[in-house]
A protein has these predicted regions:
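Feature recognizes metal-dependent phosphohydrolase scaffolds
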Residues: 1-108
């Protein structure tokens, strides 16, 4: 699923979909690992969360979801993990862009 400008059609759409919904860990060359879906404490050696890469550490704040195992914790000020496992019975998290405040509501 490596990106290159010549990707077209379904191959291009598949790569984009994978980047937006499945990217969690990368190796030193930036290749995505699709196997690990758990907590960072259990990640395979040699892999790095995408939000800790040099490219992601720019001056922009990044809000993301679809990684409930993080339980909203990234350890990075610029990376805000919004998926706190509501569908698994934990909580739903919202982020206020104006104030930077996180609000959580326990799952019903």
């Amino acid at each position: 699923a490596a990106w290159h400008d010549a990707l077209q059609g379904m191959s291009r759409l598949r790569a984009i979909t994978n980047y937006l919904t499945r990217m969690r860990l990368l190796d030193a060359q930036g290749v995505m690992d699709f196997a690990h879906k758990g907590a960072l404490s259990n990640k395979p050696e040699g892999l790095l969360p995408w939000f800790k890469t040099d490219v992601a550490r720019q001056s922009q704040r990044i809000l993301f979801g679809h990684w409930a195992a993080l339980e909203g914790q990234t350890g990075q000020d610029h990376a805000i993990a919004l998926d706190t496992g509501c569908v698994w019975g934990r909580s739903l998290t919202a982020y206020c862009l104006e104030t930077g405040e996180l609000t959580q509501q326990q799952a019903l």
